[in-house]
Structures are given as C-alpha cells and as structure tokens.
C-alpha cells in the first residue's frame, strides 16, 4: 500500500465556455457544487490532505470546500501552473499526489483508486494520467503517447492541431 497520499483539486478555471459569471466548479448538480462531488470521491481514499487550488479573488470557495485546504493561484497561467501552485504546499510530503479536476463531478472513487494502484507496482510510472478517446477532439487538450503507450506530452487545446 502507498505510504502517503495527498490530493490536489484544480478549481481555478473560470469556465469561459459555460457563459456564466459563476465559476465552473460552483455550478451545482444534484444539490452540490461540482467541486464538492470531486472531493467526496476523494475522501474514501483517506488522503493525508486535500488542497483545492482556486483563483485569486474567489477565496469564498474555501467555505464551500471545508475542511479541505485552499491554495490561491495568483495568476491564471493554465493547468500546469495550477498544479505547480498546489504542489508548493506539498513539497515536504513523499508518496503519491492525486491531481483531480474540480469540474469533473462524475469521477468515481473506484477510478481514482485504480489510478493510485497503477503507481503501487514495482518500477511504477512517475505519472498516471486519465484520458479518453473522442470522435470530436476539437474541444479538448491532447495526451500524446509514444509507440509504447507511454505519455510523451500534454498539449493544451489552444495549441493543438489535427496532427496532435
């Protein structure tokens, strides 16, 4: 079993495509904000801590995600920067860091558990990434894999073309 598990929940996205003034993670499904569904899926994994990365100026999200800690991303510089921001609070920890998107309310504890278990093998991968195949990838970033199926790079949707 993994000795240490921490969770980062990325909740700093503005949700521009939703055409709403409300942050994407605060929209509700079944009476709960999206971000709360994600946190509820993480809790059964019993992480040492959960840190929710939020955008500057939206500190009230902290009330919604309690008792999870919050980390403010001062400048919205993308997903990678949000992870870097959240990891700053976890530098002294060892073990696995689970990174989840706060606007993915359908993620299940079982799926997250399988991702963690993928790191509990001999010679584990440094990174386990959850992705999906779609008929129409135009709206999504890309996970580019090498010939062995290993992650080569992640391409943001704004930088992707039909080759990626």
Describe the function of each predicted region.
Residues 16, 24, 59, 126:
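Glycine-centered loop/turn positions within well-structured domains
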Residues 20-21, 100, 164:
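Short glycine-enriched loop/turn motifs at secondary-structure junctions
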Residues 11, 54, 101, 131-132:
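Short beta-strand/turn micro-motifs composed of small residues
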Residues 1-6, 28, 32-117, 122, ...:
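Conserved N-terminal catalytic core of the sugar/cofactor nucleotidyltransferase
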Residues 24-25, 141:
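Extracytoplasmic/periplasmic beta-strand context in beta-sandwich domains
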Residues 66, 107-164:
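Conserved core of the sugar-phosphate nucleotidyltransferase
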Residues 1-21:
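N-terminal nucleotide-binding beta1-loop-alpha1 segment
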């Amino acid at each position: 079993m993994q000795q240490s598990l921490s969770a980062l929940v990325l909740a700093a996205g503005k949700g521009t495509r939703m055409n709403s003034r409300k942050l994407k993670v605060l929209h509700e499904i079944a009476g709960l904000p999206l971000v709360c569904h994600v946190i509820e899926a993480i809790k059964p994994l019993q992480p040492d801590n959960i840190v929710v990365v939020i955008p500057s100026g939206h500190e009230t999200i902290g009330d919604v995600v309690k008792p999870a800690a919050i980390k403010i991303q001062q400048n919205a510089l993308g997903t990678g920067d949000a992870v870097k921001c959240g990891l700053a609070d976890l530098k002294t920890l060892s073990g696995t860091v689970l990174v989840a998107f706060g606007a993915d309310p359908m993620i299940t504890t079982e799926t997250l558990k399988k991702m963690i278990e993928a790191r509990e093998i001999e010679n584990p991968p440094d990174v386990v990434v959850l992705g999906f195949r779609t008929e129409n990838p135009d709206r999504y970033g890309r996970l580019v894999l090498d010939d062995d199926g290993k992650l080569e790079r992640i391409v943001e949707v704004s930088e992707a073309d039909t080759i990626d």
